[in-house]
Amino acid sequence: ANPYQLATVFTSETAFNGNPLQSSSTIGMNPNLKPEKTSSIEAGFEAAFWDNRLYLDFTYYKTDSRNQILKLATTAASGYTSQVRNAGHIRNRGYEIQLGAVPIQTSKGFRWNLDLNYGANSSKVVKLDDEGLITSYQLYSSGIQILASVGEAYGTLFGTSYVRDANGNVVVDANGLPKISTTNKTLGKFTPDWTGGISNTFSYRSLSLSFLIDASVGGSIFSNTNKTGKYTGVLANTLSGRDAEHGGLWYYTDAMGNNVRLPESPSYSVSSDGLYYAQVNGQSTRVYQDGIMVEGVTESGSKNEEVVSAEKYYHRIYSIAEANVYDASYVKLREVALSYRLPRLWTQKLHLQEASVTLTGRNLWTIYKSVPNIDPESALTTGNAQGVEAYSLPTTRSFGVNLSVKF
């Protein structure tokens, strides 16, 4: 354990009236902390056939981690808001498979190496305290919660959701906007269901070309970029419903403040300040073309027929965490490399045993992803806030030249 978690220490503050001032933490330290413990078992086998032209490597593992050091809430009467203590039992189990083959190998120097790998991991929070009183521990909270909850996968995403009826239809309120749940629910987990990759290397005499494709399937990500982008209307996918050209419905607001959909595009005029007017019931009335009709049902179960402005709709889903949680699956062309091994006659003149030049490129192409506008590998931190993205920069492609020499 960190030695600063074993005893209360004081922090120097700005002097008061020339007198030294120190403050103590609101976190109660614990001199009885124990080291975290991890026990694991692993079993596997390797097999090779046809002079190593085909090989298989399989591994199964099970890992139990206990005595995690957590900051748990405590009564304020103790003088602290939380206390450091040992708690938690997390179990991980999974398997990894690697399959390799040399499908083609000729006497003229051509060779094709193929490698496949696949891995799946399942995590479960077995318990958080010995007494069984704590059922959930918050790892992160801002717009959405990342939790360790007993009986669930480590790192579940927990937040507000759409209200739905028994048939799964979104329920709208009296104004035609999606209703927000009054209680939070599990919206996913940040760990993938499985990961895998395929690597190919084609070599012919002194030339070699290789490429790597990897994939991650399953898992969820909460995107603050998409959340805020919808609210402010700066994303291309929020053009939907903004005007008639992008599917917006024409409507006007009656004397009672209700939006009334127009059956068709009206014959309108545009005022000097850019507002639209049309004849409605024999009167010149301001009309709008940014109407959206949410696909859903009313609280009574009838089909929704209320029109809302695109602005109000996108502002509403800003507050619904479920609307901003996406599938984090992806398939990427991770790396391509072209290598040339210099002729031995050249290397001998340079007093070298071997030399090669390699051109490389990384993160060249995202073949598939589900989440828009961001890289699904983006993360707020590498710690407990995995599964949360916040205004991340685009992933960069990189290119390089490597010179390898052997004396």
Give the label of every model feature segment:
Residues G18-T26, D64-A87, D115, S122-F190, ...:
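Surface-exposed, extracytoplasmic segments of Gram-negative outer-membrane nutrient-acquisition systems
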Residues F190-T191, L393:
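Short alpha-helix boundary/capping motifs
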Residues G196:
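Extra-cytoplasmic beta-strand recognition segments
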Residues T191-D193, V331:
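Short, surface-exposed loop/turn motifs at beta-strand boundaries within globular domains
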Residues A1-S149, A215, I320, N324-F407:
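Extracellular/periplasmic, surface-exposed regions of secreted and cell-surface proteins
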